[in-house]
Regions:
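N-terminal pre-domain segments of enzymes
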Residues: 3-84, 89
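Second-shell loop/turn segments in exported
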Residues: 26-30, 73-81, 165-172, 247-251, ...
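Divalent metal-coordination and catalytic microenvironments
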Residues: 44, 83, 113, 167, ...
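Sec/Tat-exported extracytoplasmic proteins
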Residues: 45-48, 52, 95-98, 186-190, ...
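Surface-exposed patches in mature extracellular/periplasmic domains of secreted proteins
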Residues: 52-57, 101-108, 192-197
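A non-catalytic alpha/beta surface segment that caps or lines the substrate-entry region
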Residues: 79-126, 131
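Surface-exposed loop and adjacent secondary-structure segments within mature catalytic domains
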Residues: 108-159, 173-182, 195-255, 260-264, ...
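Active-site-proximal helix/loop segments of hydrolytic enzymes
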Residues: 290-312
Length: 312
């Protein structure tokens, strides 16, 4: 993660493709790959155990641009971090070139006056019915308004909604980079696995929650590169008013990023919200240690544990 190279997200199965060098095609697919980008993945991944046949290559497209085509470098290139404006430029290019990607702007700008974007990726049919799927999750989110029979009908009709949010903590720099590549893969890959995800899941991406802090961290990193041996200016805050405690704001709702996150949650009622952080371990899945809010259904708490076990 971060500016130095690609690192794992808990994937521990070595890819068979590494034995023969760069794979010619993606897994279980006749789809060609982008060889130069794939070579960058292999070169800049810190350990082969982080590579699987899902991520050891990048599928090629003659219509949809890779991150490299827009940014000028593959994701994970050493010494590169991407400003939010360039992240957004890439997602808007995806939206222009594929009907599987839609972009939205959050209601409020940050305290620093910056946009916060939301990206939605799924197949064309799902995106055409996005309003209906939001209606379904809204009804399922309030069981007081429906009975068991209607709930079963809505579940059968609806789609799972998975929301990945990146970099609420600005020094944790990897997720805004990775999410651009993930969006491309979900939009372009034609393997059975990715086709099944597009068909059955609506994927939401908030590339960067703390947009002000992200750009500040990129500034500091670039300063360090340009001024070797000099101390980086010390910061009280990453954002305009807050640092690490920005994800403790759900009660006071003092920050635009928190209000945007809440309004998006209430609009989509996602099945899963996956808030991406970074830590010393290669994989750390937090389900909370309790005591849990007594108003939360114990089934929901148990589902957190199930998700954690599945991820690990």
């Amino acid at each position: 993660n971060g500016p130095s190279n690609r690192a794992g997200n808990g994937v521990s199965t070595p890819s068979p493709a590494k034995k023969g060098g760069t794979p010619a095609k993606g897994p279980a697919s006749s789809q060609p790959i982008d060889k130069a980008y794939t070579d960058s993945i292999i070169k800049n991944t810190t350990d082969k155990m982080f590579l699987t046949d899902i991520v050891d290559h990048l599928p090629a497209s003659d219509k949809v641009p890779t991150p490299e085509k827009v940014l000028g470098y593959p994701i994970g290139t050493p010494n590169k971090l991407t400003y939010t404006k360039d992240q957004y430029r890439y997602y808007r290019e995806l939206e222009k070139t594929t009907p599987r990607v839609k972009t939205f702007v959050a209601p409020e700008k940050s305290e620093g006056g910056k946009e916060q974007m939301l990206i939605v990726v799924s197949d064309e049919a799902n995106l055409a019915k996005l309003a209906r799927y939001k209606e379904i999750t809204s009804k399922l989110g309030d069981p007081r308004t429906i009975n068991d029979e209607l709930a079963k009908q809505l579940i059968a009709e609806g789609k799972a909604v998975y929301w990945a949010s990146g970099s609420i903590h600005s020094p944790e720099t990897g997720s805004p980079e990775m999410l651009m590549e993930m969006a491309y893969r979900l939009a372009v890959e034609d393997s059975p696995l990715i086709q099944a995800i597009r068909k059955n899941v609506i994927v939401m991406i908030t590339p960067t929650l703390e947009v002000d802090g992200r750009d500040t961290m990129v500034d500091l990193y670039n300063y360090r590169k340009a001024n070797e041996g000099k101390r980086v200016p010390g910061l009280i805050y990453w954002g305009k008013y807050v640092a690490h405690d920005n994800n403790r704001d759900s009660m006071s709702m003092a920050l635009a990023l928190t209000r945007n996150q809440m309004s998006t949650f209430l609009e989509y009622h996602p099945t899963v919200l996956h808030d991406l952080h970074e830590s010393v371990p290669f994989l750390y899945t937090s389900t909370g240690t309790g005591p849990y809010n007594a108003w939360l259904d114990p089934i929901v708490v148990n589902e957190w544990q199930e998700l954690a076990y599945h991820e690990i």
